[in-house]
């Protein structure tokens, strides 16, 4: 069973430990998506008891094209390698091969050394900042964004009304304006957001929307930048010809 620890649309933290316990009771293997959680909160894979947990490099300010997969050793040892290249074998014979032990058997071919160095640097940077500071700062920014955007009558914030349940993400829609238009207008004002279905179409269908605009806060953002987002959003309907 695959489940995101933190939703990349709503920012809500799913009860992964409880989900894992329920899945294990019926013999299911749990693959957790930590791409949205690992950069923003402490993650203890042993406490969560997830069988696998994956996260990407670029979402924690590392390079693109690299990520990490944690897996319980007993499961990794049972799995065949999905890719065959150099460095992932122990020995090769005319009638077969012996694969290298975990984790080498999953590291086929030339490794992305530059990406690994960059990812390690990003992880060290987050550890130096500390998650107490990161979570406090992101909560302050998220609360500011939700209060400002929520005060606009034509803006609808997806998910919980509690900023603590958003993990630095505020996804919203604007009456009468497609999220792609919202994104283009904000981009022209020097504000970067994401628009679309965020690779989560079933969730958006459940929420009754086809797409949304997602503003993502990181600890390095400033209150002034959040205010600029709110100000720009407040002008969008007028700039689209609605007269507001």
Q: Where is each model-derived feature located?
A:
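Pyridoxal 5′-phosphate
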Residues: 1-244
């Amino acid at each position: 069973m695959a489940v995101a620890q933190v939703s990349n649309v709503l920012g809500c933290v799913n009860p992964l430990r409880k989900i894992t316990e329920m899945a294990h009771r019926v013999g299911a293997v749990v693959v957790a998506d930590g791409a949205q959680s690992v950069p923003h909160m402490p993650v203890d894979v042993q406490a969560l008891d997830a069988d696998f947990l994956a996260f990407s490099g670029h979402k924690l300010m590392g390079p693109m094209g690299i990520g990490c997969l944690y897996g319980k050793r007993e499961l990794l040892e049972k799995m065949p390698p999905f890719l065959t290249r150099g460095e992932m074998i122990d020995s090769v014979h005319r009638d077969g091969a012996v694969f290298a032990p975990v984790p080498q058997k999953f590291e086929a071919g030339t490794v992305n050394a530059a990406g690994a160095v960059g990812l390690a640097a990003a992880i060290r940077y987050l550890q130096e900042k500390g998650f107490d500071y990161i979570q406090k700062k992101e909560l302050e920014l998220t609360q500011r964004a939700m209060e400002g955007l929520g005060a606009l009558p034509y803006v609808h914030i997806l998910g919980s009304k509690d900023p603590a349940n958003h993990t630095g993400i505020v996804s919203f829609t604007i009456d009468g304006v497609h999220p792609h238009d919202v994104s283009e207008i904000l981009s022209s004002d020097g504000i970067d957001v994401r628009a679309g279905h965020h690779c989560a179409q079933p969730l958006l269908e459940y929420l009754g929307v086809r797409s949304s605009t997602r503003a993502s806060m990181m600890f390095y953002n400033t209150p002034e930048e959040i205010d600029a987002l709110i100000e720009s959003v407040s002008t969008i309907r007028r700039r689209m010809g609605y007269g507001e």
